[in-house]
């Protein structure tokens, strides 16, 4: 225990977490700090430098804790599961304050890494106009798992169906819940997580990628809502994770995953200040058929911004052709480049090109594109 000091003081300090990829400690952003001494309690949040100053003064050294309830509007569950937010009790220390460096492999490292990636994602949303995930987002971190998911089950009000021998248990197994399937299935919706993050064996950089992937799904949910997500979940239940690219709602799933995977990788590269302009997508195709390469190319070649792509992920966009049609509708002057981003990556749109107003251009492309009878709605 650190020595007491005379007089009332407002405790302050800095909380950092170790980035084992960069080899340095980085601030833990926006997390709640709680101080108490018997019946006196005080809370505040760290700033973007990881620094905090308590609102209340203490004459004697209080007990310090980090509570993973972030000022941006999300909670992280961990050691207490759905009962309470994850927290790190730091013990009794001086009333001058207490600082903590959270090392890789230590008790709270996973929570701090997930916290920072989520904080940065919310900040990106504020800067770009991409919708944030739904309010009061619940993220449950599992330190021994390697899989993650964004089921959003507590927010889905539409029926979820499945075909064949699939069931809720199969669904949970398919997205990595394993032996917890039965327990989670019986929990009330209000205590189900929106997102699960598996951090087992992951570096800080990998956690950053995975968290941004899942949060991109949550932003997608904010725009399309329950009915769309029920179809997404039904596909997972029926075909097992991503399936093989066939079956009902396969392209709906493919669109969601091309957005999620590419956003995870793009955000990760931006955080580490690595340009993707001259970097061909090198992560492979999830399940062999999903093509994050499309969104990656649209961004790295500055054809469309992340926000412009996001604006096309609306209700009714549940096939590749409908996605292309929406992009053509919004950005007709980029139609040729948009088409190329798809065809270069193995997806051939069957959508008519828009009339750009350029007679020479339109005349040249009239016979190039296969006409489509599909009507976008």
Where do the protein language model's features map onto the residues?
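Short Pro-Gly-centered beta-turn/loop motif in secreted/extracellular proteins
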Residues: 27, 53-63
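Short pre-active-site segment immediately N-terminal to the catalytic Zn-binding motif
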Residues: 194-211, 251
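Zn2+-dependent metallopeptidase catalytic core
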Residues: 55-57, 72, 98-168
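Post-HEXXH active-site segment of zinc metalloproteases
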Residues: 222-252
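Short, ordered, surface-exposed loop/turn motifs in non-cytosolic proteins
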Residues: 10-39
């Amino acid at each position: 225990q650190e020595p007491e000091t005379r007089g009332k003081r407002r405790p302050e300090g800095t909380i950092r977490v170790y980035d084992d990829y960069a080899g340095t400690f980085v601030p833990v952003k926006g997390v709640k700090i709680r101080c108490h001494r018997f019946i006196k309690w005080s809370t505040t949040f760290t700033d973007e430098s990881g620094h905090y100053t308590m609102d209340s003064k203490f004459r004697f050294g209080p007990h310090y804790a980090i509570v993973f309830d972030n000022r941006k509007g999300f909670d992280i569950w961990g050691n207490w599961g759905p009962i309470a937010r994850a927290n790190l009790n730091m013990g009794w220390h001086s009333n001058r304050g207490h600082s903590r460096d959270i090392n890789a492999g230590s008790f709270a490292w996973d929570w701090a890494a997930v916290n920072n990636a989520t904080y940065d994602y919310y900040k990106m949303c504020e800067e770009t106009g991409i919708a944030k995930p739904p309010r009061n987002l619940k993220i449950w971190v599992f330190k021994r798992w390697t899989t993650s998911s964004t089921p959003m089950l507590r927010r889905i009000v539409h029926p979820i169906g499945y075909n064949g021998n699939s069931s809720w248990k199969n669904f949970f197994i398919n997205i990595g819940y394993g032996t917890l399937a039965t327990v989670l299935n019986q929990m009330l919706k209000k205590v189900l997580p929106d997102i699960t993050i598996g951090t087992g064996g992951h570096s800080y950089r990998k956690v950053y990628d995975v968290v941004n992937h899942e949060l991109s799904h949550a932003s997608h949910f904010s725009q399309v809502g329950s009915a769309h997500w029920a179809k997404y979940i039904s596909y997972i239940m029926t075909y097992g994770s991503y399936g093989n690219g066939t079956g009902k709602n396969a392209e709906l799933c493919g669109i969601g995953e091309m957005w999620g995977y590419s956003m995870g990788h793009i955000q990760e590269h931006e955080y580490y200040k690595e340009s993707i302009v001259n970097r061909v997508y090198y992560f492979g195709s999830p399940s062999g058929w999903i093509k994050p390469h499309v969104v990656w190319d649209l961004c790295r070649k500055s054809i469309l911004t992340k926000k412009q792509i996001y604006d096309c992920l609306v209700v009714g966009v549940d096939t590749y052709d409908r996605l292309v049609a929406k992009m053509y509708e919004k950005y007709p002057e980029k139609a040729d480049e948009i088409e190329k981003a798809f065809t270069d990556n193995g997806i051939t749109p069957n959508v008519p090109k828009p009339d750009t107003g350029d007679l020479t251009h339109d005349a040249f492309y009239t016979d190039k594109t296969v006409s489509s009878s599909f009507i976008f709605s």
